[in-house]
Amino acid sequence: MDIFEVLTAIIKRKIILMRTGINEYEALIKAELDISSEYHIPLLDIQKLVGQ
């Protein structure tokens, strides 16, 4: 899985979470955690990709 696929997965998950009523920041954090555990990527690496 390359960088763009990871970022795309995070954005898609964030959008789904935002549609449930979660605000954008909380949705991003939850999406990062979900993708981190789903694809076995360290959370710190995902946060570097996103730019946090």
Please place each PLM-identified region on the residue numbering.
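C-terminal alpha-helical interaction appendages
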Residues: 1-52
